[in-house]
Regions:
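Gram-negative bacterial Sec-dependent N-terminal signal peptides
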Residues: 1-23
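A residue-level marker of the well-folded mature domains of exported/periplasmic proteins
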Residues: 22-327
Length: 327
């Protein structure tokens, strides 16, 4: 009898050990869910996700809705939860709107990490390339220098519910009021819906409404190319300053023509890689602390504020150095 018991215990132990080896060998499934698919910004982010998969062996992939619609993104997150991934990395159109579905993901045992959502509650961590207020101040200082610190300017956001875009603009306007009193923001924030054609049309409308306008600040990666096209059509290169977030791949022609003065950005590929790496760290039970090096450019000495991880990852690009960034 004792022999049988010992044999049974040994068999159970062997089974548990074998099971642990299988679990350890099973790669994590991490699905990155972006605001929308098919635009340069998130195409570049997908390169980072694929690089993470190649480097680590994780089953890492990226999905996005065909257009920037909050309800479509929520449904996509719902569909993704049903696939039972190990983790999801979400770049939300509206952090507030996705809170309930992210809560559902966490309740289902799915690790949640976000980007561009510093107010998020239902995630283990949110990853930001930099402190949004610092970036907004930087954009305003650049715009003000170009405008000679005086005159009217207009601001654009991809969405009025995009926390990141609004934080940039709010910080920029606060900086203007504090340091550049001869400058004036005209109208309210213009919403491009992350659509270059909409940004173009609204820029033309702003130019008609405010003929003395001297500057634009864009937030979505599709704002400045849309604005730049409007500037070219009106032959206003060199007369109106255009600054904002963008990528060389869809702004270089306007940088070269002078329709856009400068773009600033962080590499979305590195952000995508960072989200996936942090998700795996959470899966492994690891904690992030201020001063940690994630081993990713711009995230070599992060700052942790609550659950928000901040890097120092922005770069400025003009026509002089655009060729250095082939994406």
């Amino acid at each position: 009898m004792k022999t049988k018991i010992k044999a049974t215990v040994a068999l159970l132990g062997a089974t548990m050990i074998a099971s642990s080896f299988v679990n350890a060998a099973t790669p994590s499934t991490i699905i990155t869910i972006v605001k929308l698919s098919g635009i340069a910004w998130f195409d570049r982010m997908e390169q980072g996700v694929k690089r993470y998969a190649k480097d680590t062996g994780a089953a890492a992939s990226q999905v996005g809705a065909a257009k920037g619609d909050v309800q479509l993104q929520i449904q996509l997150i719902e569909d993704t939860i049903a696939k039972k991934p190990t983790a999801i990395a979400v770049v939300p159109l509206s952090p507030e709107a996705v809170e309930p579905v992210l809560k559902k993901a966490a309740a289902a045992g799915v690790v949640v990490v976000t980007h561009e959502a510093s107010s998020i509650q239902n995630a283990s961590y949110d990853i930001e390339a930099f402190k949004n207020a610092d970036y907004g101040v930087h954009l305003m200082d650049s715009l003000a220098k170009c405008m000679g610190e005086e005159g009217q300017y207009a601001t654009f956001v991809g969405s009025l519910t995009s926390k990141t875009h609004n934080e940039w603009v709010d910080a920029a306007v606060a900086r203007q009021k504090e340091k550049y009193p001869k400058m004036e923001m005209v109208g309210s924030k213009n919403e491009s819906t992350d659509n270059e054609a909409v940004a173009h049309d609204k820029a033309l409308e702003v130019l008609r409404t405010y003929p003395k306008l001297k500057g634009f600040q864009g937030s979505s990666s599709l704002d400045v190319p849309g604005i730049g096209r409007a500037i070219e059509e009106r032959s206003l290169q060199g007369k109106i300053c255009v600054f904002g977030t963008g990528l060389p791949s869809n702004t270089k022609q306007y940088l070269d023509s002078g329709a856009i003065n400068q773009i600033s950005f962080w590499d979305p590929a590195d952000a995508g890689y960072a989200m996936n790496k942090v998700a795996q760290m959470v899966i492994d039970g690891k904690k992030i602390a201020t001063g940690d090096d994630l081993g990713i450019p711009g995230y070599n000495k992060v700052t942790l504020d609550g659950k928000v991880i901040y890097g120092q990852a922005w770069v400025d690009v003009t026509k002089e150095n655009a060729a250095k960034y082939p994406f």
